Design a protein with these regions (language model features):
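Intrinsically disordered, low-complexity regulatory regions of eukaryotic signaling and scaffold proteins
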Residues: 19-20, 33, 42, 269-278
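Bacterial N-terminal signal peptides
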Residues: 80-95
Length: 523
């Protein structure tokens, strides 16, 4: 043999070469066979003496295929070898095809346009919906990914395909069994939960089977929203029940209603008069008290067999302890970290997808319409009165930043806010002296508090004598909202139009046609 060139050679015009497109270098060995570089135009020649399973081969690929020499001890070997390679090629092709399907499933999708929410990305794919929740504490990264798949056999097939694409050779059935056992859902093998999946930026990814029909809800605003969406029967467990001013939930808990008849009627009135909500209807299924949201009763949660947990995330929380190991989808309700009132309200669309509430889009559309109409109305009024919010808590006075949701609400009400020039989107931790110095000339002082008897000016001075330096205190222009009696948080979290109306009334007392205050009352 002459000089052997170091190059790659294709399997010529043989059928096997066309099927595979594989390259074999001069140093390649396939089943102990070495390919020489002395190929003829008619095909590929194998060098002699190469031993394959103890047999010498001197064959040439031609139009007629593979020919054995007389020295071959097993005349059927070439056919066997060809079939073996063909089987290998077909296996690779099928695997490649399957991977292609999985890749295409993720690559192809339609992104739903969201007008206000900055922390949500929703992409509709064939057979599933991908939802990425942005990390509000680490801009540009994903906090949690959700893969929403409808329940049923077809959904199971989609879940298996996506899991194989993410986890490679993971035993999907075994993962499903482990998930079922961790939930205590005997005999239930529904593919849902984390199952070891990871999303963008290494975040947790959960498969959520929709509609969610059973959930543990850790916050009162989301309980109220589910009632408005007609999904109240999906609430099977709650945390911090004593703070939930929803009469029907207290009944389903088997407790005396925490919300008085006054608060219940004011809640219903707020929603119906806004034109964007509907009165809550009662549900028949009982609700379990799962303890504190900071230390939930894990055993009670397991006993519920919930399909999801709705939890508000916190910065540097370090995860959710034992809840992380239950393999139950944890819906991190980061809506409260949106920096615009309508941005938080637009999360209604996400919750509508989770619970398959057909009214979600129309509910948000009504909220948006009412909010923008009120904003336009306020813009036509003269600049409003100046407003100071909240009060001293210990040694700190927390005030909304100028770019926060509350700061934007005050701006849209055309009110004068003493920290309007601030660039923060969260709360400002200020000393009482700083606030008094900045806001001594404010016209209106409006704050919230929880529990106890209605406050008086004398009680406020006992709390902090510096309040008397405020002009609003001196003139008696003080407004309070007792959130132990008034369903403030349950209502306004996803209904910013109601709170906007309140602030327009407070800062523009001369405005007509806005009705009476629903949450704040003059001290």
């Amino acid at each position: 043999m002459n000089n052997v060139l170091e190059k790659d050679i294709y399997l010529g015009s043989s059928a096997l070469g066309q099927a595979t497109g594989m390259k074999f270098s001069d140093s390649d060995r396939v089943s102990g066979m070495k390919f020489s570089d002395s190929d003829k135009a008619s095909g590929l020649k194998k060098s002699v003496p190469n031993v394959v399973f103890g047999m010498k081969i001197s064959a040439a690929y031609g139009a007629g295929g593979l020919k054995s020499s007389a020295a071959s001890k097993h005349s059927g070997f070439p056919l066997f070898f060809g079939l073996l390679v063909l089987w290998f090629v077909l296996s690779l092709s099928l695997s490649s095809c399957q991977c292609g399907k999985q890749s295409a499933a993720w690559d192809e999708g339609d992104t739903i346009r969201l007008k206000y929410a900055q922390l949500l990305t929703i992409v509709e794919h064939e057979g599933f919906t991908e939802v990425n929740v942005g990390n509000p504490w680490k801009k540009g990264t994903v906090l949690h990914q959700y893969i929403l798949i409808k329940k049923g056999k077809k959904g199971d097939e989609t879940a298996e395909m996506l899991m194989k694409g993410r986890n490679g050779s993971q035993d999907v059935a075994g993962a499903s069994q482990a998930m079922a056992e961790s939930q205590g859902a005997a005999g239930s093998h529904t593919l849902a939960g984390s199952l070891g999946l990871t999303g963008p930026d290494g975040c947790r990814a959960d498969i959520v089977r929709t509609p969610i029909c059973s959930s543990a809800v850790f916050t009162s605003p989301h309980c109220q929203l589910l009632y408005e969406l007609g999904c109240q029967n999906a609430i099977r467990g709650v945390c911090d029940s004593k703070y939930i001013l929803i009469e029907d939930i207290q009944k389903r808990l088997g407790k005396p209603a925490a919300a008085s008849s006054e608060s219940g009627s004011r809640q219903s009135s707020a929603l119906s008069e806004s034109g964007s909500g509907k009165s809550s209807t009662s549900a028949s299924l009982p609700i379990a008290d799962c303890g504190s949201s900071m230390q939930p009763d894990v055993e009670k949660i397991i006993a519920l067999h919930p399909e999801a947990l709705l939890i508000s995330p916190f910065e540097n929380s370090g995860g959710y302890g034992k809840l992380d190991n239950l393999n139950i989808p944890i819906i991190e309700a980061a809506d409260y970290m949106e920096t615009s009132p309508l941005g938080r309200a637009e999360w209604i669309k996400f919750y509508g997808l989770l619970f398959e509430a057909n009214t979600a889009d129309s509910l948000f559309a009504a909220i948006e319409k009412e909010y923008l109409a009120l904003k336009t109305q306020a813009a036509k009024l003269p600049k409003g009165l100046s407003i100071l919010t909240e009060r001293k808590m210990g040694s700190v006075w927390y005030s909304p930043g100028g770019k926060s949701t509350m700061g934007i609400l005050l701006k849209d009400a055309n009110a004068r806010y003493i920290f309007a020039d601030d660039e923060h989107s969260g709360s400002l931790s200020l000393s009482p002296e700083q606030v008094i110095a900045r806001g001594s000339e404010v016209d209106v002082w409006a704050f919230k508090y929880f529990g106890g008897q209605p406050l008086s000016r004398a009680a406020l001075l006992q709390e902090y004598d510096g309040y008397k330096a405020l002009r609003a205190f001196q003139t008696g222009n003080i407004y309070e909202c007792n959130t132990d009696r008034i369903p403030y948080f349950e209502t306004v979290s996803f209904h910013p139009e109601i709170l906007l109306r309140e602030f327009i009334i407070l800062s523009h007392p001369q405005a007509k046609g806005l009705g009476a205050l629903r949450f704040y009352r003059k001290m």
